[in-house]
């Protein structure tokens, strides 16, 4: 070792020791883990059982060992005084103790924590050395309420009530001992005397948390200073605990005297049933009195307007007898109270506003309890002002020009009103529309005032306000006001103001926003936009933007012909105009292209007599269809747009299988010629990675096919395929599909459930119900002796039946619990017919109601946990019939004294109508009344409750055809009609409301809806649709047929509420349509309190049989395996077809549905026509309003990388699987018929689903057809074998043999194994099997130490029909896989001159897939051995990893000295290295690089990216430059004008120029790019100068000069011969390399210390060789340290190789006196640079002998699978743990077949954050993960994983780990009997190989029968 190296090493060690010492000193209290004792919450006694909250000690860091989380601690922690309970680590930071019963109150405790129970990797506060002290919550009592109670029914019952609440259950005996109740007298000197102790009783609340103390009854007090006092002694304690109260609790209640009756008064304003204001005098008495007694002894006097002092405000002391003699007596009208005695009494009266009353009550009334007044009492009450109101009546803005033309104004309590009328100038109308921020009837123009666009008139009105409480109606005739020459028709802005005192305001509409004086009671002004016109307008906008405008006469209800309809733009231009035709319709093309000043704002409609308008695109004018069934698929605006139906052959695939996709593409209108249109097919993995891209060109028929073989490492989960069309440089998806990729097993069974009672679509009876489960083999025979498990759930439901969709049935359980009954049924075994019977008795749950029974059954394979499932539901009811009703009336809005009829039917369980007698119809009125109710304290009070009072009862009989029943509407109110049977059980209940004048305002807000019913749901083109319409009133309507546009329309008139209308469908209409009806009220109708417009929509379909291609598919009904079957497809037209057949067991797993493609092309489309209108704004005529006035008023990239890491963590010894039984014909031509053939696999038995889809050659007809072929041999073997085993595992396997012959068979069964397995016991069996029956044979196998896919061969010999011996053979495979995932190990060490170092192999690996080698060299090329091995074994996919993996071949392939190393790396013969061997790796990179390059020449991390990555682009360029310099052959096309290489250089030039705000990392990549350009002799002087300038301006010299950016710049300047600049820049780099660096570091932004060191070494060795001696020893030591600590990734490995290669070029030396020995023998081969040895044995001690005069380096590299699980857990930067428990969370090591175990995986990082971690969790053999669609996504949600994959033998999860623990839970199912080893769970960082963790060996888990 030279002096320089020694000094360097010594300095490094010294620095390291110094840093370590500093670190130890920093382990102080500030950095230690702290803890906090959270206060214990008081037990929640409201829960049942009570919820006792635990003691929780929270730590500031992950204090729990990860293996202890969620587990009970039984030692290492104690509590004093002792208390039974459980200590549990609830998380890694929370330690809790929960007592068995409850916490004693106010108890001090001490907790001692032994640090053995804590995470040993952390440093803890010194406070943990002391006991942790805490105190439980103290017992407290609170006096909540106290009052003197007078019983409302018994006058002599009066006493005090005190309510106390307690924090904990009180000790009853102690409480009653601590309690005193006394009658006391309180003196004026604050003393008191006890008059007498009182008896008391105590009522306790639930769980003794509340107590009501009721004193004994007392007489009325003789004086007003008597009290009932309660005292609770402070010595009171809780039932559990010893702490007492802090002080005594004392409180008292005053005892009233006999003369304590008093009252207070007030006058309020209330609304009466006529909607008028009236005065009500309220008297509030201190005790309950009788109203009829008060009425006799009360007087009211209207005082003079002014007091004797001439003041308007009266005071009580001003009232004298003299005043009263001059006062006027006021009559009072008593209002009834709900009870005889009441505290509040009320009287109607009528006095002038602001006048005062004197109320006098004589002392001749006695209150309940004997209370009286000493003498007559009086009080003063003054009347408030009546509310003021002025406003327009009704909602709307349109007055018919043919009608009365009167606007109705309602006023109250105003003497005068002012009406301002602004006539909008027609040319200014556009401003009103364009600037309106409000709605139509109340516009808000913002800054623009109406004065600017209108001509104004003003009219003042004086009103007779003698009765300010009454409403006055004014009918304003606008025609008379504007009686100038012009007609009154037009558009007006009206504002009405009450009592206006400022008539000369500059701007009339200053209160355009609502008047600030308005409040809840008063309205001083109102404004409205009024249109006087006879033109109603409806506009319908289609999906393509075309417009249909309908114009009708408001007065006549008829379409208006010849009206001018103009589209007005924002600037007032007429951009379109036309006349309506005889149907009142005008059509416009799309207005979408009119923009800015020409943007359309309204339709202006005019005739010679009338003018109207409709704003365009105003939300308040659009009809809201959200309450109708208008949802569905949205059609494209372009009828010629393409739509594609993508389908696959089976819905689920295993990795490495071929996906077959059929594509049917059609234009939306089926008219466009499709031939040769290019489309793009993209296929994405579950992580969103583009896996396949293919351009297809459409066939003329529209049928195409794409096939793609999935990678062997294909991600599991849901894959996505899409078809894109390119339009104007944009890609649009026109079709897509999803499918599953899973390592699944096809089903072998099928299952079906039936019930013994035939119920059709009705229900079954609850008694004598039997569910029969039929289990069958998929090859058609009963599955005998199979276990079947079942459970049932009973839920209430509201019965509904499709054939009686309009009838409402009843369920009296509908408000009860969601689940009525749930149970597991006894396990059954199938009989010879494959049936298992489950008797079900639901009698006790039936009652007189209906429930839905959900019956779930699982049928299991023989002695296996694999099962098939089914769910069957049926309605259950004990009733022999159910009653339903329907009505055409709106039952929430029935007018008084108008007929309303409901129709009743009764149906039996078969849903046949039947007659029912002896029913009763009881009418009940629902109202709230006061009901005497006992309180929790024991006292009685009146409470308001909803009750139902019987009004009348009638008998009812329902006929077999149904019976009409007329509802009673004679009186307004809320009613229920209850139907009951002869046993008084409710069988239906109808709620309805009768609306009277008092609630007409409610009716006005009601949303009126048409009821529409079509005569059927599906029609043929050109057929007539019959529509039954029920409207709220008579009127006129418009019917339209709509979907994406209006296809047909028809006007109609209805003189009654109900009518039947008809409209004809167009001939060319296909698919889904909507009947849309707008119905406007007749202006002469009396129904003015509902909206003038009602509307409704109902969908329908037109069948598409004319598009259906007639197909017939023939296949053999039954064949045997190995035979060739023919499928014949016939068509009535020349066609293109796809024929495919699939094993039904696969389709069953996938849930595959063979659907009709026509239903895809003709789905339920959404209603996309937008309807705008003004008909809902029509105001009622003034005369109609006055009729009622008499009675009423108005994925990021890191995640993608993680996905691709899966390959390295999969099972390389996975079993060989059979090819799926599936056939795909590809597209074939059919001219009449076509026959294709398929050979059935030799060992397949099951059912083939045969399917075909075809399109006619012209593409206008489409069909699909399916059939089945049964494949069944005479003797069928069905083995049950685990999918995987681990060496040493034992498992029972079995074979079920089905004898499908007609005679009994004696079968000789023999099983043979491969070396991976051995038998325990015999391998041959003799079995007797009855004809058409099954039997089984059992074997026991054990896995040996041989890894790999192993085949078990079963041979069954039997006699065929000719009595010849025949063999039936079945092969089944399983995987014998190692217990640990793949491991890498590299050991690098320096050997001093003249020394020998002997080292054992780091790991003991299985021979299979093992690679072990040693390299020894005087140059540090030994370092290259480890990283090269790692790179070539790393499964890489992203661009950086792909380039890194190819780098060893680029650097070494042309150097003969590296041939042994390359031989080992490529695993090929030496003569092939440099040719075929390198081609495999390099061609992979060369093939993928074009897909990673963007159109701009740069490169993305993955393919199909839009943006390139700076570093990746430079790195690829570096790779290409190195390859070209080393004379590797690159594709010639890359060097063309737009070739890959030249485009890469262009991208380098582009990205070498810095941008403002670049980070240091970005400038580093730009400098890297500039360096590479310099290598290519392209002088990037400007870029270099700009980078340098930006570095100096934005970053400190300390920051950037020690960064890699400085090295790249120095190298570039050196090549440009600017040595002074180069030397200045390289000097800080050299200093950085010899300086110490932090021990802790991470990878970020393509940089870490190892990448930095190797990059700098590369630059110095290549460009500054003279400086190499300054850094080589120190930097090589660091690199060795990092490699030995496994702290390398693909990029750092590649950069190390580049550096070592450059170093070797400067240190060429001959190999001398170096040997690699084993047991004293030389085992290496020599090259000019190093000695190399392949190591073949499992265990070897390797000696490295250095007999030279200089130091040498050796490297031991191993890649493979460890033979044994580690006995100790490993935690390097990560901690990981996994547990197996049952459902209750108890650890388990033994389960029964079919049981589910619950897996919990926990992970956390030792630092704050570790990115890109992969977890590999191998399942024990004999278990399978419970997979279901979406399972991967569920796992992701549960612990924020980036991706989770479920494989056949393991779970792979990718995530970022944090200091906070993450938890993943999933489930495994025991499917095989045996004893299986539990593999450790393994986690590692994908970028920092030193960060990893695994759990210790956990022994075995046993699965038994």
Swiss-Prot record:
- Provide the cross-link position: Isoglutamyl cysteine thioester (Cys-Gln): 1438-1441
Single GO term (MF): endopeptidase inhibitor activity
Q: Which PROSITE patterns match?
A: PROKAR_LIPOPROTEIN
The protein's matches in Gene3D superfamilies, at most eight in alphabetical order, are given as: 1.50.10.20, 2.60.40.1930, 2.60.40.3710
Keyword Lipoprotein carried by entry:
yes
Write out the N-palmitoyl cysteine lipidation residues: 22
What membrane topology was assigned to this protein in its record? Lipid-anchor
- In UniProt terms, what function does this protein have? Protects the bacterial cell from host peptidases.
State what protein this is by name: Alpha-2-macroglobulin
Q: Where in the cell is it found?
A: Cell membrane
Say which family it is in: Belongs to the protease inhibitor I39 (alpha-2-macroglobulin) family. Bacterial alpha-2-macroglobulin subfamily.
| Keywords from the named record | Cell membrane, Lipoprotein, Membrane, Palmitate, Protease inhibitor, Signal, Thioester bond
Indicate where this protein is primarily found. Answer: membrane
Q: Which InterPro entries match?
A: A2M_N_BRD, Alpha_2_Macroglob_MG3, Bact_A2M_MG5, Bact_A2M_MG6, Bact_MG10, Macroglobln_a2, MG2, Terpenoid_cyclase/PrenylTrfase
Q: Where does the signal sequence lie?
A: 1-21
GO cellular component term, pick one: plasma membrane
Report the CDD domains cross-referenced here.
A2M_like
- What species was this sequence derived from? Pasteurella multocida (strain Pm70)
Provide the lipid-modification sites (S-diacylglycerol cysteine): 22
């Amino acid at each position: 070792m030279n002096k320089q190296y020694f000094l360097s090493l010594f300095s490094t060690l010294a620095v390291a020791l110094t840093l370590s010492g500093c670190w130890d000193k920093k382990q102080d209290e500030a950095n230690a883990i702290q803890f906090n004792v959270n206060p214990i919450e008081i037990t929640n006694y409201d829960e049942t059982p009570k919820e006792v909250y635990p003691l929780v000690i929270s730590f500031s860091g992950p204090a729990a060992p990860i293996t202890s989380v969620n587990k009970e601690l039984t030692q290492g922690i104690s509590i004093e005084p002792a208390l039974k309970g459980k200590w549990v680590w609830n998380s890694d930071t929370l330690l809790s103790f929960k007592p068995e019963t409850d916490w004693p109150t106010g108890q001090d405790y001490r907790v001692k924590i032994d640090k053995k129970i804590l995470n040993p990797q952390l440093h803890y506060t010194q406070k943990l050395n002391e006991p942790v002290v805490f105190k439980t919550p103290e017992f407290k009592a609170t006096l909540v309420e106290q009052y003197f109670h007078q019983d409302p029914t018994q006058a002599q019952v009066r006493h005090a009530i005190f309510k106390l609440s307690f924090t904990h259950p009180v000790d009853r005996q102690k409480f009653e001992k601590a309690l005193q109740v006394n009658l006391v007298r309180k003196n004026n000197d604050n003393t008191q005397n006890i008059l007498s102790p009182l008896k008391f009783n105590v009522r306790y609340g639930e769980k003794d948390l509340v107590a009501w103390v009721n004193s004994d009854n007392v007489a009325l007090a003789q004086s007003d200073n008597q009290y009932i006092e309660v005292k609770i002694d402070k010595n009171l304690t809780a039932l559990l605990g010893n702490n007492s109260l802090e002080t005594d609790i004392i409180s008292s209640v005053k005892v009233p005297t006999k003369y304590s009756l008093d009252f207070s008064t007030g006058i309020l304003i209330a609304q009466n049933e006529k909607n008028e204001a009236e005065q009500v005098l309220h008297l509030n008495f201190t005790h309950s009195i009788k109203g009829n007694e008060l009425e006799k002894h009360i007087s009211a006097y209207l005082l003079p307007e002014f007091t004797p002092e001439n003041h308007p405000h009266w005071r009580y002391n001003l009232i004298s007898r003299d005043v009263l003699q001059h006062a006027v007596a006021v009559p009072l009208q008593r209002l009834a109270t709900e009870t005889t005695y009441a505290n509040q009494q009320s009287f109607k009266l009528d006095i002038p506003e602001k006048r005062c009353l004197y109320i006098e009550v004589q002392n001749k009334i006695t209150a309940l309890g004997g209370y009286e007044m000493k003498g007559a009492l009086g009080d003063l009450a003054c009347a408030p002002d009546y509310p003021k109101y002025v406003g327009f009546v009704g909602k709307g803005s349109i007055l018919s020009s043919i009608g009365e033309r009167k606007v109705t104004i309602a006023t109250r309590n105003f003497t005068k009103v002012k009406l301002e009328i602004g006539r909008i100038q027609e040319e200014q109308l556009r401003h009103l529309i364009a600037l309106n921020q409000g709605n139509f009837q109340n516009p808000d123009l913002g800054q623009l005032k109406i004065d600017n666009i209108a001509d104004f008139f003003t009219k003042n009105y004086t009103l007779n306000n003698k009765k300010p409480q009454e409403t006055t109606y004014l009918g304003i005739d606008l025609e008379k006001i504007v009686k100038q020459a012009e007609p009154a028709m037009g558009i007006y802005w009206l504002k009405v103001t009450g009592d206006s005192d400022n008539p000369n305001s500059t701007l009339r509409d200053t209160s355009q926003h609502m008047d600030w004086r308005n409040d809840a009671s008063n309205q001083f002004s109102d404004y409205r936009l009024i249109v006087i016109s006879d033109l109603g307008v409806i506009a319908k906008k289609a999906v393509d933007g075309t417009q249909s405008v309908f114009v009708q006469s408001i007065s006549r209800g008829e379409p208006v012909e010849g009206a001018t309809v103009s589209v007005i733009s924002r600037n007032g231009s007429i951009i379109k105009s036309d006349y309506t035709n005889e149907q009142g319709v005008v059509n416009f093309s799309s207005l979408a292209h009119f923009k800015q000043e020409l943007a359309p704002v309204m339709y202006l409609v005019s005739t010679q007599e009338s003018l109207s308008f409709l704003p365009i695109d105003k939300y308040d004018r659009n009809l809201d269809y959200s309450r109708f069934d208008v949802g569905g698929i949205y059609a494209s605006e372009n009828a010629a747009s393409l739509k594609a139906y993508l389908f696959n052959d089976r819905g689920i695939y295993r990795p490495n299988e071929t996906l077959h996709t059929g594509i049917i593409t059609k234009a939306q209108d089926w008219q466009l010629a499709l031939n040769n249109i290019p489309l793009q097919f993209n296929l994405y993995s579950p992580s969103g990675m583009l896996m396949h891209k293919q351009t297809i060109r459409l066939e003329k028929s529209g049928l195409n096919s794409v096939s793609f073989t999935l990678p062997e490492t294909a991600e599991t989960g849901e894959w996505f395929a899409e078809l894109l069309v390119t339009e104007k440089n944009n890609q649009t998806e026109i079709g897509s599909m999803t499918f599953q990729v899973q390592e699944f097993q096809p089903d072998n069974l099928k299952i079906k459930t039936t019930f013994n009672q035939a119920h059709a679509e009705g229900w079954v009876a609850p008694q004598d119900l039997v569910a029969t489960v039929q289990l069958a083999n998929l090859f058609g025979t009963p599955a005998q002796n199979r276990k079947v498990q079942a459970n049932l759930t009973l839920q209430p439901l509201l019965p509904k039946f499709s054939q009686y969709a309009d009838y409402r049935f009843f369920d009296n359980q509908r408000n009860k619990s969601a689940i009525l009954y749930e149970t597991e049924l006894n396990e059954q075994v199938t009989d010879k017919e494959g049936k298992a019977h489950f008797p079900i008795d639901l009698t006790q749950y039936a009652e007189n109601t209906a429930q839905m029974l959900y019956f779930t059954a699982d049928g299991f394979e023989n002695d296996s946990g694999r099962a098939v499932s089914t769910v069957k539901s049926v309605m259950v009811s004990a009733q022999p019939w159910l009653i339903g009703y329907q009505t055409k009336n709106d039952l929430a809005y029935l007018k008084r004294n108008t007929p309303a009829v409901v129709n009743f039917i009764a149906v039996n369980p078969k849903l046949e109508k039947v007659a029912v007698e002896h029913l009763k119809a009881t009418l009940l009125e629902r109202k709230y009344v006061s009901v005497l109710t006992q309180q929790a304290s024991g006292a009685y009070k009146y409470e308001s409750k909803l009750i139902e009072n019987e009004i009348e009862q009638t008998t009812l009989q329902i006929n077999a055809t149904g019976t009409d029943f007329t509802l009673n509407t004679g009186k307004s109110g809320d009613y229920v009609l209850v139907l009951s049977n002869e046993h008084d059980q409710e069988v239906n209940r109808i709620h309805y409301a009768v609306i009277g004048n008092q609630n007409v305002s409610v009716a006005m807000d009601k949303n009126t809806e048409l009821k529409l019913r079509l005569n059927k749901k599906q029609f043929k083109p050109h057929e007539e649709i019959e529509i039954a319409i029920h409207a709220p009133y008579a009127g006129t309507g418009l019917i339209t047929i709509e979907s994406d546009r209006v296809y047909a329309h028809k006007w109609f008139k209805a003189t009654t509420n109900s009518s039947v209308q008809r409209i004809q469908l167009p001939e060319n209409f296909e698919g889904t349509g909507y009947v849309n009806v707008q119905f406007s009220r007749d202006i002469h109708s009396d129904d003015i309190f509902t909206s003038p417009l009602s509307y409704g929509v109902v969908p329908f379909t037109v069948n598409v049989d004319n598009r259906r291609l007639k197909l017939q598919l023939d296949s053999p009904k039954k064949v045997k395996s190995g035979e060739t079957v023919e499928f014949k497809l016939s068509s009535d037209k020349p066609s293109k077809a796809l024929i495919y057949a699939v094993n039904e067991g696969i389709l069953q797993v996938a849930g595959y549905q063979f659907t009709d493609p026509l239903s895809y092309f003709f789905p339920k489309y959404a209603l996309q026509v937008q309807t705008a209108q003004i008909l809902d704004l029509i105001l009622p005529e003034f005369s109609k309003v006055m009729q009622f006035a008499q009675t009423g008023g108005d994925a990021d990239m890191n995640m993608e990388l993680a996905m691709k890491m899966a390959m390295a963590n999969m099972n390389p010894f996975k079993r060989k699987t059979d090819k799926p039984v599936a056939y795909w014909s590809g597209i074939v031509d059919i001219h009449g018929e076509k026959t294709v053939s398929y050979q059935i696999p030799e060992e397949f038995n099951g059912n083939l689903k045969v399917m075909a889809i075809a399109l006619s050659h012209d593409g206008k007809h489409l069909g699909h057809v399916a059939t089945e072929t049964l494949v069944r041999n005479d003797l069928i073997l069905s083995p049950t074998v685990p999918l995987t085993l681990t060496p040493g595992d034992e498992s029972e396997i079995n074979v079920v043999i089905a004898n499908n012959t007609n005679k009994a068979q004696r079968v000789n069964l023999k099983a043979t194994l491969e070396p991976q397995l051995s038998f325990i016991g015999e391998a041959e069996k003799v079995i007797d099997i009855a004809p058409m029956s099954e039997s089984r044979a059992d074997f026991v196998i054990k896995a040996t130490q041989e890894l790999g896919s192993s085949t078990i061969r079963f041979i069954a010999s039997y006699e065929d029909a000719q009595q010849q011996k025949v063999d039936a053979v079945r092969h089944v495979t399983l995987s014998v896989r190692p217990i640990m995932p793949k491991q890498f190990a590299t050991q690098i060490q320096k050997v001093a001159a003249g020394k020998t170092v002997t080292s054992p192999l780091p790991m003991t690996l299985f021979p299979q897939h093992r690679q072990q080698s040693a390299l020894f060299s005087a140059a540090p090329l030994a370092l290259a051995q480890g990283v090269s091995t790692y790179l070539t074994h790393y499964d890489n996919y992203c661009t950086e990893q792909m380039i890194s993996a190819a780098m060893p071949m680029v650097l070494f392939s042309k150097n003969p000295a590296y041939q042994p190393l390359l031989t080992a790396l490529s695993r090929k013969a030496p003569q092939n290295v440099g040719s075929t061997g390198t081609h495999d790796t390099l061609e992979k990179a060369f093939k993928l690089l074009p897909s990673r390059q963007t159109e701009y020449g740069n490169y993305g991390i993955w393919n199909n990216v839009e943006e390139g990555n700076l570093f990746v682009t430079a790195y690829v360029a570096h790779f290409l430059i190195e390859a070209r310099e080393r004379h590797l052959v690159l594709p010639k096309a890359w060097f063309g004008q737009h070739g890959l290489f030249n485009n890469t250089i262009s991208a380098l030039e582009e990205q070498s120029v810095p941008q403002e705000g670049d980070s240091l990392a970005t400038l580093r990549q730009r400098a890297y790019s500039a360096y590479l350009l310099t290598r290519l002799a392209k002088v990037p002087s400007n870029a270099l100068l700009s980078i340098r300038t930006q570095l100096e301006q934005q970053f400190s010299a300390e920051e950037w000069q020690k960064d890699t950016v400085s090295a790249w710049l120095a190298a570039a300047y050196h090549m440009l011969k600017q040595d002074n600049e180069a030397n200045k820049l390289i000097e800080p780099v050299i200093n950085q390399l010899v300086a110490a660096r932090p021990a802790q570091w991470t990878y970020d932004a393509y940089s870490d210390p190892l990448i930095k060191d190797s990059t700098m070494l590369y630059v110095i060795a290549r460009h500054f060789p003279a400086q190499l001696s300054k850094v080589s020893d120190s930097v090589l030591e660091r690199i060795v340290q990092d490699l030995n600590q496994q702290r390398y990734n693909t990029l750092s490995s590649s950069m190390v190789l580049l550096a070592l290669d450059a170093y070797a070029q400067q240190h060429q030396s001959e190999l001398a006196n170096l040997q690699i020995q084993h047991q004293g023998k030389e085992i290496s081969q020599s090259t000019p640079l190093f000695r190399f040895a392949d190591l073949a044995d499992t265990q070897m001690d390797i000696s490295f002998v250095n007999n030279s005069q200089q130091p040498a380096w050796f490297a031991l590299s191993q890649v493979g699978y460890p033979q044994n699980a580690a006995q100790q857990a490993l935690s390097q930067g990560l901690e990981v743990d996994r547990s197996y428990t049952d459902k209750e969370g108890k650890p388990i090591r033994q389960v029964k077949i079919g049981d589910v175990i619950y897996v919990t995986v926990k992970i956390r990082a030792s630092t704050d954050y570790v990115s890109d971690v992969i977890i590999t969790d191998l399942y024990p053999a004999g278990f399978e993960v419970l997979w279901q669609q979406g399972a991967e996504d569920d796992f992701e949600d549960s612990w924020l994983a980036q991706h989770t994959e479920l494989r056949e033998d393991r779970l792979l999860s990718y995530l970022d780990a944090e200091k906070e623990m993450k938890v993943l839970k999933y489930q495994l199912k025991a499917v095989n009997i045996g004893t299986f080893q539990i593999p450790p769970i393994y986690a590692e960082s994908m970028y920092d190989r030193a960060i990893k963790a695994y759990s210790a060996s956990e022994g075995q888990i046993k699965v038994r029968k």
